[in-house]
């Protein structure tokens, strides 16, 4: 007997995507958006199948992601943002709540939610992860969600 193995393909054709983007640290966040859009387009998504929702900060990402997921207008959500450590515990609180909140949205709605939120120690690390030395985490998040949409379609 052979074990059946199911995987999601990397075709975005026909899928509808919501990008939920934090405006805080937007000069880096916009690079994540560009990376995500590049990935979606390269894998067959049409611009008409993508909606970008912008919210004030990373703390608001889960709320907007949940609204997008529950709208019935999207097959997946890509959450993008940039949280850079400062000199207070604020970073730890925001990073933890955004992470937990986005995971909860995926579990509650059964809509794939990709985590493209940078949590870095400094500005240099954030810039590296938005398209210079360490690739573009927006692109990576879009790739993840494309695969998850196609995996979900096989259940």
Curated annotation (Swiss-Prot):
Q: Where is the active site?
A: 90 (proton donor)
Q: Where does (2S)-2-hydroxy-3-oxobutyl phosphate bind?
A: 87-88, 129
Q: What is the E.C. number?
A: 2.5.1.78
List, in alphabetical order, the Gene Ontology terms for molecular function in this entry.
Answer: 6,7-dimethyl-8-ribityllumazine synthase activity
Q: Which residues bind 5-amino-6-(D-ribitylamino)uracil?
A: 24, 58-60, 82-84, 115
Q: Which InterPro entries match?
A: LS, LS/RS, LS/RS_sf
Carries keyword Kinase? no
Task: List, alphabetically, the Pfam families matched.
Answer: DMRL_synthase (PF00885)
Q: In which pathway does it act?
A: Cofactor biosynthesis; riboflavin biosynthesis; riboflavin from 2-hydroxy-3-oxobutyl phosphate and 5-amino-6-(D-ribitylamino)uracil: step 1/2
Q: Which SUPFAM superfamilies match?
A: Lumazine synthase (SSF52121)
Q: Name one GO cellular component term.
A: cytosol
Q: Which GO terms describe its biological process?
A: riboflavin biosynthetic process
* Catalytic class of the enzyme: transferase
Q: Give UniProt keywords alphabetically.
A: Riboflavin biosynthesis, Transferase
Reaction(s) catalysed by this chain, per the record, are: (2S)-2-hydroxy-3-oxobutyl phosphate + 5-amino-6-(D-ribitylamino)uracil = 6,7-dimethyl-8-(1-D-ribityl)lumazine + phosphate + 2 H2O + H(+)
Top-rank taxon of the source lineage equals: Bacteria
Q: Could you tell me what this protein does?
A: Catalyzes the formation of 6,7-dimethyl-8-ribityllumazine by condensation of 5-amino-6-(D-ribitylamino)uracil with 3,4-dihydroxy-2-butanone 4-phosphate. This is the penultimate step in the biosynthesis of riboflavin.
Family per record = Belongs to the DMRL synthase family.
HAMAP family noted in UniProt: Lumazine_synth
Q: What is this protein called?
A: 6,7-dimethyl-8-ribityllumazine synthase
């Amino acid at each position: 007997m052979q074990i059946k193995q199911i995987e999601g393909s990397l075709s975005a054709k026909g899928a509808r995507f919501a990008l939920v983007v934090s405006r805080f640290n937007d000069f880096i966040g916009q690079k994540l958006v560009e990376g995500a859009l590049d990935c979606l387009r390269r894998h067959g998504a049409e611009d008409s199948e993508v909606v970008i929702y912008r919210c004030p900060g990373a703390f608001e990402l889960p709320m907007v992601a949940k609204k997008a997921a529950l709208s019935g207008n999207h097959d997946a959500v890509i959450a993008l943002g940039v949280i850079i450590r400062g000199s207070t515990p604020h970073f730890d609180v925001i990073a933890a709540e955004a992470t937990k909140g986005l995971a909860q949205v995926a579990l509650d709605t059964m809509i794939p939610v990709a985590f493209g939120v940078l949590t870095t120690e400094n500005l240099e690390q954030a810039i590296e992860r938005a398209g210079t030395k360490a690739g573009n985490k927006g692109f990576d998040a879009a790739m993840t969600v494309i695969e998850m949409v196609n995996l979900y379609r096989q259940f």
